[in-house]
Amino acid sequence: MYDTMPGATRESLRETIMECERVGHAKGLAAGLSTALAAAGATDPPGRIAALPTDQVPEGAAVVPNAMAEQEGISFVRWPESSAEPALDSLAVLLGAVRIGVTRNLMEHAVTHLSGRTSGGEPTVRKQLVLGAIADAMTAADAARECLLVAGDVPAAVVDTHDRLTELDWEATKLLGASGFITDSPARAGYVSRLAANCWVPRGDT
């Protein structure tokens, strides 16, 4: 996997992973994806659809409409079929890091949301079950990061990390209650990040 970033050392890869997470958390999915694509030198997706920052869509490209993705600054572009066998590369790892940043942001929104609601005369966020769910989610995000750092060259581990992040986003969305299921919810970024991962993370024989 790391051969796709010529000259990169394990330490520099670690720094790139952390930077992709930081950008995803601070600036959002589109900025994070842009950082990951540039670092990985990615060109062709493993399938027929590429997820790209909207401002990087090639002129004249056929774009698959998706309102939620558009609001996140992401476009899904039809791509010419490649004769190369799909293979997991460094972009799958870096996109995983971006998704961790997006997931952390979603969890923080959930904590803020619950802090402003009360149940039984106290903030909902203080309820034992809610505290446990938040703690579990944060621990899982840390575990996902560690997996990318130490097992990023193991395709099955990278695919599993993306699956776990999808589950984490769903759990955080449920903490937002009904507001997590409207278009303008912060959960939108988590949903679109899953679609982006579906474009760039091949799921062949891992």
Predicted regions and their residues:
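Glycine-rich phosphate/cofactor-binding loops in nucleotide/flavin-utilizing enzymes
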Residues: M1-L37, E72-F76, L176-T206
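Generic detector of well-ordered alpha-helical segments enriched in charged/polar residues
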Residues: R14-M18, A30, S34, V111, ...
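Glycine-rich beta->alpha junctions and the first turn(s) of the following alpha-helix
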Residues: G32, A36, A42-T139
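C-terminal helix-coil-helix/basic helical segment that borders enzyme active sites and/or dimer interfaces
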Residues: E122, M138-T166, W170-T183
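Short, conserved alpha-helical segments within structured domains
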Residues: R126, V130-A133, A157-R164, A187-R188
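Short, charged low-complexity intrinsically disordered segments located at boundaries
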Residues: A135-R145, N198-R203
